[in-house]
Swiss-Prot record:
Zn(2+) 1 binds at H114, H116, D118, H179. The lineage of its organism: Bacteria, Pseudomonadati, Pseudomonadota, Gammaproteobacteria, Pseudomonadales. GO terms for molecular function: hydrolase activity; metal ion binding. This is Metallo-beta-lactamase VIM-1. GO terms for cellular component: periplasmic space. Weakly inhibited by beta-lactamase-blocking agent sulbactam. Keywords: Antibiotic resistance, Hydrolase, Metal-binding, Periplasm, Plasmid, Signal, Zinc. Its EC number is 3.5.2.6. One of its GO terms (biological process) is response to antibiotic. Zn(2+) 2 binds at D118, C198, H240. The gene is VIM-1. InterPro entries: Metallo-B-lactamas, NDM-1-like, RibonucZ/Hydroxyglut_hydro, VIM-type_MBL. It is an enzyme of class 3 (hydrolase). Class B beta-lactamase which confers resistance to the beta-lactam antibiotics, including penicillins, cephalosporins and carbapenems. Acts via hydrolysis of the beta-lactam ring. Has penicillin-, cephalosporin- and carbapenem-hydrolyzing activities. Residues 1-20 form the signal peptide.
């Protein structure tokens, strides 16, 4: 796993225009992490983090700019668990095709970590492909209120800050309100990989991002819960941008606090 971190750190100091390497299947990190400049909207890249653990990376246009978005794929025996859609129907269809091409195992279950379109957009594509889709009751309720796609099944036991439940090869953790009131994080104990979703920002971020549904007061406290619950995490994957280590958590808290302070000053 130290090799994974080394590979990621080397990449973070390299040019973001570098071309990503093909996916490796040996369990080793698969070269440089794909960036927004390398992925046309409608295409998806896979990046192997560890044996049986991949991130999926897509891009989407929003307000005249193009943004990257991460998700997770975890092997569960002869099946795959998908964490988050690829931000839209076209991207999610491309994701399933890429998984079939590069991994060759069926996606049987999918979890959406909060109600925004970058996490649930494409749920209908998954459902049509026979994938059982899951989210917390809060996420399902908020998605319906927003007019977004709604995962079919409810994940129970994640209603209070600090709640954690095992779901196949991963642990789902509700740290409390942050980027949204319903955001979950996902931990892969076999690989010490923490997927922070949109509750966690990449190291290069200087903005709190989309805070329309955020709880700026609680976000740093929720990040602290993640830090305390997963001190052994070696790789941390944000919802958007480059993975890194546990320092992404403190960086996120600092960015959110700075945003809140600026808002108060204004």
């Amino acid at each position: 796993m130290l090799k994974v971190i080394s590979s990621l750190l080397v990449y973070m100091t390299a040019s973001v225009m570098a071309v990503a390497s093909p996916l490796a299947h040996s369990g080793e990190p698969s070269g440089e992490y794909p960036t927004v400049n390398e992925i046309p909207v409608g295409e998806v890249r896979l990046y192997q983090i560890a044996d049986g653990v991949w991130s999926h990376i897509a891009t989407q246009s929003f307000d005249g700019a193009v943004y990257p978005s991460n998700g997770l794929i975890v092997r569960d025996g002869d099946e795959l668990l998908l964490i988050d859609t690829a931000w839209g129907a076209k991207n999610t269809a491309a994701l399933l095709a890429e998984i079939e091409k590069q991994i060759g195992l069926p996606v049987t279950r999918a979890v959406s970590t909060h109600f925004h379109d970058d996490r649930v957009g494409g749920v209908d594509v998954l459902r049509a492909a026979g994938v059982a889709t899951y989210a917390s009751p809060s996420t399902r309720r908020l998605a319906e209120a927003e007019g977004n796609e709604i995962p079919t099944h409810s994940l129970e036991g994640l209603s209070s800050s600090g709640d954690a439940v095992r779901f196949g090869p991963v642990e789902l953790f509700y740290p409390g309100a942050a980027h949204s009131t319903d955001n979950l994080v996902v931990y892969v104990p076999s690989a010490n990989v923490l997927y922070g979703g949109c509750a966690v920002h990449e190291l290069s971020s200087t903005s709190a991002g989309n805070v329309a549904d955020a709880d700026l007061a609680e976000w740093p406290t929720s990040v602290e819960r993640i830090q305390k619950h997963y001190p052994e995490a070696e790789v941390v994957i944000p919802g958007h941008g480059l993975p890194g280590g546990l320092d992404l958590l403190q960086h996120t808290a600092n960015v959110v606090k700075a945003h809140k302070n600026r808002s108060v000053a204004e």
